Amino acid sequence: MIVLVIEKIYAFLWGDLITIPLPQESSIGISLLVILLIPTGIYFTIRTRFLPVRLFPDMIKALMAKKETKDSLSTFQTLIVSTATRVGMGNLVGVVAAISAGGAGAVFWMWVTALIGSSTAFVEGTLAQLHKEKDPLYGGYRGGPAYYIHHFCEEKLKKKKKHVLIAVLFAISGLICWCGISQVISNSVVSSFENAFGIPPLYTTIVLVAIAAVIVLRKNATVKVLDVVVPVMAVCYFAITIFIILKNIGSIPAVFGRIFEEAFGLRQAVSGGFGAVLMNGIKRGLFSNEAGSGSAPCAAAAAECETPVSAGLTQALGVFVDTIVICSCTAMIMLTAPENVVAGKEGMDLLQSAMRYHLGEFGVIFIAVTLFLFSFSTFLGILFYARSNVAYLFGDKWIFQTLYKILALVMLFIGGIAAYTFVWDLGDVGIGLMTIFNTGILYLLGGQALSALKEFESTK
């Protein structure tokens, strides 16, 4: 019964809610989440006067500001945490799936989604800073959508409340989502290691869970580990991609030509035509950069910065890094490989085949290790996010923080030895519900972020 209910909710959130017919027997199927996120991104892009382009230098400047204290984080460290969760399987398997289902043109629409998603990320990151509070458990600050939703409702009701229903529902949705993602993470890692090294899933799972437990059960080890892992993995992946591009420099103009031709339906590469290209690019872009879902603000709130806008600008930059840089790296690896090399393959097998073509067996090993690092950092990042939501629901009690970490580790173990589609759907339902609650409140509270932006620009 519960499984059936989850499947129905999943279909409602992620399935095609509206189908728009197009010429040449093509159509666009639009899901509820696309209906929510794309207009929200466009709205805030207009209201911020195209912030991702106009204030890109300020994003870099905000990132360089060093203002962390003993307990709180700098804007750079919060970018590291949010990038850890954004840069995950979606940047590898997700991009592969988008190109497989929507052709090379899907890459262009992922770029577009990132540009408008940056504005949404700015607004939610700024709001997280405006409504943060002291964290007596871990030190520094905590916050996120549960907190700014709570403060908004208190203000409207004109009375203090311990909990607000919508904020509670957001926090619960987040915890459900992140537990589900834990399973997906371990399943992807063990599959990749089995393909690359022939290691049995159980062995990989035990090592993965053991390493994770050592880190997450220590008070503040998560951010310290991510400070090292995330920059190293991102730079290495980018460097390998540059090498592959230079190795195939003669085919790069044709690759970009293919991306733009297929993006606008000038060349049909997949069944479904322009509609399939457009929606696959948009959906994968939204899933990868997480803008609007309310995840990243949990990290943005932890920053110690001169102005709330600095946290917002840093999160906007995070969307750029995730989609424009890392997702594009995967796309270049895929699209510079001959079609006969990747024909008939899907998922990680497809990406590993492309890497084998470019770099031999080293490429297969490299992509397996990269997936491990991307996925492991995602797991650490989502447990950082969970801190503030657990505290909102259960108060400042270590027992509940520890119990949730143990639950996530159990889910990590289960995902490594068995694949339960139900739990994966549960994770997607969780992030879908988070998005509904968060985007709704962004329209109501977004004026605060826009006012902060106006004040920031007036003092530049």
Model-derived features: positions:
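Selective recognition of specific alpha-helical transmembrane segments in multi-pass small-molecule
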Residues: I116-E124, T204-K219, V230-G250, K283-L286, ...
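Alpha-helical membrane segments and immediately flanking helix-loop junctions
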Residues: T69-A101, L127-L130, L137-F152, L169-I172, ...
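Extracellular/periplasmic helix-exit of transmembrane alpha-helices
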Residues: E124-P136, I242-R258, G272, A302-C305, ...
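Membrane-interface loop-to-helix entry segments
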Residues: L36, F44-I60, I166, N187-F193, ...
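Transmembrane helix-loop junctions in multi-pass membrane proteins
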Residues: R47-P52, N91-V95, C177-V190, A213-V225, ...
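Flexible loop linkers connecting adjacent transmembrane helices
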Residues: F50-T75, A97, G103-A104, S119-K161, ...
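Helix-loop-helix module between adjacent transmembrane segments
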Residues: T40-T45, T113-Y141, H150-N187, S191-I215, ...
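N-terminal alpha-helical transmembrane segments of multi-pass membrane transport
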Residues: M1-M89, I99-A106, G117, F413, ...
